[in-house]
Regions:
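Short hydrophobic/aromatic-rich beta-strand segments that constitute the beta-sheet cores
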Residues: 14-16, 44-46, 66, 87-89
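Ligand-binding loop in jelly-roll beta-barrel domains
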Residues: 70-92
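Short histidine-centered beta-strand/loop micro-motifs
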Residues: 17, 25-30, 46-48, 55-57, ...
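Histidine-centered metal-chelating micro-motifs
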Residues: 22-25, 62-77
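A short glycine-rich, His/Asp/Glu-containing loop-to-beta-strand
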Residues: 1-27, 31-36, 89
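Glycine- and acidic-residue-biased ligand/ion/polar-headgroup-sensing regions
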Residues: 30-50
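Short acidic-glycine-tyrosine-enriched beta hairpin
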Residues: 8-11, 51-70
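Short, flexible surface segments
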Residues: 21, 40, 59-61
Length: 93
C-alpha cells in the first residue's frame, strides 16, 4: 500500500492511496471528516482488532463522505481482491 501526498493547507490534507491486490495497511484510525474518491474502484475490506470485517465498494469516479471514527476504535484496510484499488482521500482539519 502506497500513500502519495497530493496537497496540504490549513483546512485540509489530501493523499492518493494505491492498494495493490492482497496487501493491507497497519492498524490506524481516522479522527477527522473526509471525502474519498474512487480513482480505480474496488471492494476494500476493513478489519477491526477483533477480526470483524466490513467490505466497502468504492465505485470509480464516485465520491464518499465519512465521519471520524468513534474514540478508541481502530482498523486496518485490506485489499482481498485481484486488482489494484486507487483512492483519493481529502481529510478536513
Amino acid at each position: 500500500m502506497t500513500r502519495v501526498p497530493q496537497f496540504e493547507n490549513e483546512r485540509a490534507v489530501s493523499w492518493k492511496s494505491v492498494i495493490p491486490p492482497h496487501t493491507e495497511s497497519t492498524m490506524h484510525r481516522h479522527d477527522r471528516y473526509r471525502t474519498i474518491i474512487g480513482v480505480v474502484g474496488g471492494d476494500l475490506t476493513t478489519v477491526s482488532p477483533d477480526g470483524k470485517k466490513t467490505v466497502t465498494r468504492y465505485e470509480t469516479g464516485k465520491a464518499y463522505w465519512q465521519a471520524p471514527m468513534p474514540p478508541g476504535e481502530t482498523h486496518k484496510d485490506v485489499n482481498e481482491t485481484g486488482t489494484t484499488i486507487e483512492l483519493i482521500v481529502v481529510e478536513m482539519k
